[in-house]
A protein has these predicted regions:
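Canonical Radical SAM [4Fe-4S] cluster-binding loop centered on the CxxxCxxC motif
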Residues: 1-13, 71
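Short acidic donor-binding/metal-coordinating loop in glycosyltransferase active sites
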Residues: 39
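Conserved AdoMet/S-adenosylmethionine-binding subsite of the radical SAM
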Residues: 18-29, 33, 42-189, 193-201
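Auxiliary Fe-S-binding modules of radical SAM enzymes
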Residues: 155-306
């Protein structure tokens, strides 16, 4: 997977040698999940996609510990024909079916940013065809100012996705990378949008989590705004963390109505956040692997689409 954060060239690595990936996975049985992402891996034709997926399910490679494969893509929103009428649509879906037949879970992590993206009839057909393979479709999107910073938009998206057989998964906070300032939504506003949207859907759509920041220490969720000892604070918790012991643990940050990202926040009731090293102001050179570029699930390996 490409590093998602700028100014960290040492964290960027990529290879098109699938044997390297297979060898790594064979040596690391603790890895149970592989995420194919990018970029958008569904830009790849079926022969290239097969070159990555087939070795993961080939019993000769001894990768029985791989339980799930995920494909992160926005192609359902901008190119649903990829799964319906394109020349290799049938072959792609056949490949999905082979992953399912191997006994593994296959999840298409579909990005939809607005309800309008769910309207085309060809999308409904694409969703039906993917689900017919046995794959599941989980949906996620960033909160984008002037595009979807409205509870009604998210309510409609989640309801429609459930009706179509998709599973709402994440509302993300816009990453602090690139020229994203115009689209950034303050965390306080993002929490209000999420809460109001969440209140208007049934339990079937409440599989969704957010607003979540995929930051360097891990995935950080904004759980609310409250007062503690007379101080207004954000309540947050780690959905995923470099240190697994921090997962699920709540912590506080001083309320800032303009804060848009984790690095905009200041700890309160402590001199540091739980994920910050206690002994070092910076990560020392002898611990180069402490803060990789993108937080994943426990036992997960992310593979770049090349």
């Amino acid at each position: 997977r490409w590093a998602q954060f700028v100014d960290e060239p040492d964290l960027k690595m990529a290879t098109d040698d699938i044997s390297t990936l297979v060898a790594y996975l064979a040596e690391h049985p603790e890895v149970t999940s592989v995420l194919i992402t990018g970029g958008d891996p569904m830009i790849m034709g079926e022969p290239v996609l097969r070159r990555y997926l087939e070795p993961l399910i080939d019993p000769r490679n001894g990768l029985d510990h791989i339980e799930s494969i995920r494909i992160g893509t926005k192609s359902l929103a901008y190119w649903p024909q990829r799964f319906v009428t394109d020349p290799d649509a049938d072959d792609t879906l056949m490949l999905f079916g082979e992953v399912i037949a191997s006994g593994r879970n296959l999840a298409v992590m579909a990005h939809f940013s607005h309800p309008r993206e769910l309207e085309p009839p060809v999308l409904a057909e694409a969703v039906r065809r993917i689900r017919d393979t046995g794959a599941v479709i989980r949906t996620q999107a960033p909160l984008i100012r002037s595009i979807n910073d409205d509870p009604a938009a998210w309510r409609e998206m989640w309801r429609t996705q459930v009706r179509m057989g998709m599973i709402p998964y994440y509302m993300f906070v816009e990453r602090d990378t690139g020229p994203q300032d115009y689209f950034a939504v303050p965390l306080a506003r993002g929490y209000d949008v999420f809460r109001q949207a969440y209140q208007g859907v049934s339990g079937l759509a409440r599989t969704v989590r957010g607003p979540s920041m995929s930051a360097t220490p891990g995935k950080v969720c904004v759980d609310g705004v409250t007062e503690v000892a007379g101080i207004k604070v954000f309540v947050l918790h780690m959905i995923q963390a470099r240190d697994p012991s921090l997962v699920g643990s709540p912590f506080f940050a001083r309320f800032d109505p303009a804060a848009c990202w984790l690095t905009d926040l200041e700890p309160v009731f402590a001199d540091r956040f739980p994920f910050e090293p206690a002994r070092y102001e910076t990560v020392p050179d002898e611990l180069p692997g402490l803060w990789p570029s993108e937080p994943g699930e426990p036992g997960e390996l992310m593979v770049p689409a090349i």
